[in-house]
Amino acid sequence: MKLLLPVAGRSSRFPGMRPKWLLTLPNGQLMIEKSLSGINLTNITEIVVIMLEEHKKFVSPENIVESLKKISNGLTVKIHLLSNLTSSQPATVASYLFENDYDFPFFIKDSDNYFEYMPTSDNSVAYIQLSDLKLVDAGSKSYIKINKFDEIELIAEKSIISDKFCCGGYGFNSSKLFLETYNSLGGDKNNDLYVSHIIQENLLNGINYLSYQAKNYEDYGTAEGYYAHVKKVKSIFCDFDGVLVVNSSKFAQPPWQYEPNNENLKFISNYLEDSPYSKLIITTSRPTSEKINIIKFLLKYDICCHEVITDLPHAGRILINDFSKSNPYPSSQSINLVRDSNNLSEYF
């Protein structure tokens, strides 16, 4: 089956920035790369990105093909270019389907979120339980009601009819049927058409759809959701002496001691566990010869540091970082902590 990634929207919720599917997330991936990375591609034979011709000024189609091939184990990746904006996501999908004479199953994946899921070639909808999430724009989603056999009885757009919302993954076993239903609902003339409307029309016509629960959902579809995700991730430049251990020096007996500041160590360990994309960089005046000892010491407290920068001057430090609409002001912050105090958590 084919995996379709429709990315031809206006990105109107992200003014003054690149198209949202090309925004860089904290882990260094483009949003479209991150979106694809959670999908089990066992049943996928081809990936199709449906993008606007005008977006070529931001990225070359060849680069998109190569980047998606790398994270899909070499699957065939094709680009379908649109010369004009479409009226809806179904219209974007239909523009590609119209150019294929044969009938085939396909799976639509939104490009502005992440979830873990394995598409199958049947009619299906991926969903998430509302109770599994801390932050979600509940009113912007579509929802499903299901029976005890996990069959969908009703799907509704922007109406909370259950605790199961559609997370942006839709399977169709027939491209021809999708187009027939699309045309019956007004096709290109319908400016308020959603994929959920296609599915609901098919349900009314007696066609079955199954529901499958997805996992580990992350939403970047709105500016608020995107910024909330970005803000959860930090590059933490942390002094060693006086913060994570009681301050020591080469003149101590013995030199460079490792008396733990347990409260601060516990806080940093918990922070990194809760924010797995964050990175800890240790900054210290200790010599390079102590680097291995610092790493081993931190591992005792379940802290894995990204880097240890040694031999710094025993003097003030200044952090300089740029800011932009995709990484807004203030993009850097500083904490001045009383030496050997154990209340680092209060400043975060």
Regions found by a protein language model. Name each.
Residues 114-189:
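Conserved core of the sugar-phosphate nucleotidyltransferase
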Residues 2-5, 13, 24, 29-105:
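Conserved N-terminal catalytic core of the sugar/cofactor nucleotidyltransferase
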Residues 54-62, 135-136, 288-294:
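Short, charged/polar "capping" segments at the starts of alpha-helices
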Residues 165-233:
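Conserved alpha/beta core of the MobA/IspD/sugar-nucleotide pyrophosphorylase nucleotidyltransferase superfamily
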Residues 91-99, 140-145, 224-229, 317-328:
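Short, surface-exposed amphipathic charged segments that create phosphate/polyanion-binding patches used
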Residues 103-114:
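Short beta-strand-to-loop acidic/aromatic patch adjacent to the donor-nucleotide binding site
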Residues 233-348:
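HAD-like aspartate-dependent phosphatase fold
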Residues 1-17, 231, 235-241:
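N-terminal nucleotide-binding beta1-loop-alpha1 segment
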